[in-house]
From Swiss-Prot:
Annotated control of activity: Inhibited by UTP.
Gene3D superfamilies, sorted: Acetylglutamate kinase-like
Cellular component GO terms held in the UniProt record: cytoplasm
Protein's cellular compartments: Cytoplasm
Entry-linked CDD domains: AAK_UMPK-PyrH-Ec
Protein's name in the database: Uridylate kinase
Functional pathway: Pyrimidine metabolism; CTP biosynthesis via de novo pathway; UDP from UMP (UMPK route): step 1/1
Enzyme Commission number(s) of this protein: 2.7.4.22
InterPro entries referenced in this protein's UniProt entry, alphabetically: AceGlu_kinase-like_sf, Asp/Glu/Uridylate_kinase, Uridylate_kinase, Uridylate_kinase_bac
Binding residues for UMP: 51, 71, 132-139
UniProt key word Zinc: no
Primary gene name: pyrH
Coiled coil regions, renumbered to chain: none
GO BP field: 'de novo' CTP biosynthetic process; UDP biosynthetic process
Length: 236
């Protein structure tokens, strides 16, 4: 029986300890790897990792990096994170590969129609790095794009310290109400910022099932899939 394809998007910040200046946390990466190893028994996993632990927009401004170039630095950061995580997963005996929208010879595989069609023929977990390969597009947009391209049945979006969608920013407004389930159209009507509009519109048009959850919570990916933790479900 063929395993279903899913996409998981996590931030680069989720790989580091907030109390440290290091780019990576051994404990967090181990926890993530253990969850992925368990999930790989039931699913073909497409993984998209942000690059914010290495490079962020504020750093670009501080150094005077032009926006287009800054976007490419950020995309390269996702390649670095994906390659590091791939090595960790391979050490656990998992079959993995890193695909990239930016060519990195000897390190990544090219993203093209053929590689996408055959992506899980020889691996359990595929990293989609390098964003869309173009500036001005977010990691959220890249996530939705890859989900469409591999016919993912489920898309999980891990947020830093936020366990789903609220009526307002819960960090600024204590009266903000948690939303357990919502349609794409309702979210658009209420102007809820779940992700950038390009990504959200793409997801709506292709009828993707989204689960928004707190990546920082213990065993959060597994618990979200098994409906055992707090998260928001978005569908048409």
């Amino acid at each position: 029986m063929q395993k279903p394809n899913i996409i998981i998007k996590i931030s680069g910040a989720s790989l580091q300890d907030k109390n440290s200046n290091d780019c990576y946390s051994y404990q967090r990466i181990n926890s993530l790897a253990d969850q992925l190893k368990s999930l790989a028994k039931k699913y073909n996993i497409g993984l998209i990792v942000g690059g914010g632990n290495i490079f962020r927009g504020k750093l670009a401004k501080d150094f005077g990096v032009e926006i287009n170039k800054a976007d490419y630095i950020g995309m390269l950061a996702t390649v670095i994170n994906s390659t590091l995580l791939e090595s960790k997963l391979q050490s656990l005996g998992l079959k993995t590969k890193v695909l990239s929208a930016l060519e990195v010879k000897g390190l990544t595989n090219e993203i093209n129609p053929k590689s996408l069609a055959e992506v899980f023929s020889d691996c359990q977990i595929a990293f989609f790095s390098g964003g869309t390969g173009n500036s001005h597009f977010t990691t959220d947009t890249a996530t939705v794009l890859r989900a469409i391209q591999i016919n993912a049945q489920l898309v999980l979006i891990g947020k830093d310290g936020v366990d789903g969608v609220y009526t307002d920013d819960p960090k600024k407004n204590k009266k903000a109400k948690f939303i357990e389930q919502i349609t794409y159209q309702q979210a658009l009507n209420d102007q809820l910022r779940v992700m950038d509009l390009t990504a959200f519109s793409l997801a709506k048009d292709h009828n993707l099932k989204l689960l928004i959850f707190n990546i920082e919570a213990e065993q959060s990916i597994i618990k979200t899939i098994e409906n055992k933790n707090k998260h928001t479900k978005i569908t048409n």
